[in-house]
Amino acid sequence: MNEHGERDERHGDGERHGDGAAGTHGAAGARGEGGEGARDIAGLPTPAGRPDEATEAFLAHRSLLFTVAYELLGSAADAEDVLQETWLRWVGVDLAVVRDPRAYLVRMTTRQALNRLRTLRRRRESYVGPWLPEPLLTAPDVAEDVELAESVSMAMLLVLETLGPAERAVFVLRDVFGLEYGEIAEAVGKSQAAVRQIAHRARSHVAARRPRGAVSAAETRDALEAFRRAVETGDLQGLLDLLAPDVVLLTDGGGVVRAAQAPVVGAGRVAEVLGRIADTATLLPAQVNGRPALLLRLEGRLDTVVAVRLDEGLITGLYAVRNPEKLSRMQRETAVRR
């Protein structure tokens, strides 16, 4: 979906964020084999008898670690890379001195994610057009954990993008995953007093920017169904009734496919753009990032993932991810946990 409602063609090289292909990713995704001469799940030699213990501990918390990394980075491909780096460090740890593997692994993952986040921020400064998080196809039961579903939603991830790296890590670890201040202090390399101040500052920052009013999954689903009908039937007034006057449409093509290079602002302009795809688009419901969303298909192929932000019953944000390098996670469900 571009600003002119045209069908896209690939152009330019665009920025590549890594391989988010379906299935497990490198080291952190497969189970190793035990025994003498065994190799760890990265394919590197490890001492006899060691892989099973390390692997079991890692796999027990893998979905949690992925979710931590993803919420800090907004990129599944980069989150998988962080898990790879975490695994390689984990197999070098003396497990006999680790009292709490979960806390230890979360700290390791957070440190690796913060290192990568600083690099990603510089890369995103040169990103072609609006940058949006990489969407995840998630299971319906994610919505049952309301706080988790909100924290991985497209709208919340965009709010988290407005925090500094340390603020983002502290907020995610404290308010989403419920870590103690001492654990967070070790993860981010700051004192507990500093972490408490950062948490207060980050919480206020997020509260001022998060969606206004509690919105249930059912309300979002109903709004999206009305939105789908209006788009597919070309019902302009129906669209205008759903859109807030100051609604913002962001389209992420990453320089790989055509997309609006700047936000499209205002109900009239957004409805006009959406009206141009009525004859060619098929919109299907899906569960994306813990919330109801729509998949836009053209000629039978996935073209765009559409997520929304609702404030007080109206759509205030439309997030259309078109960059094909970000759509590979839509081929299978990704487990997110806390």
Predicted regions and their residues:
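Active-site-adjacent scaffolding segments
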Residues: 1-9, 19, 36-81, 85-224, ...
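Compositionally biased, low-complexity flexible segments
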Residues: 18-35
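Short, well-structured alpha-helical segments
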Residues: 79-83, 240, 271
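Amphipathic alpha-helical regulatory segments at dimerization interfaces
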Residues: 226-233, 242, 273-276
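Short, well-ordered alpha-helical segments enriched in acidic and aromatic residues
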Residues: 234-250
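A solvent-exposed, acidic/Ser-Thr-rich amphipathic alpha-helical stretch
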Residues: 245-283
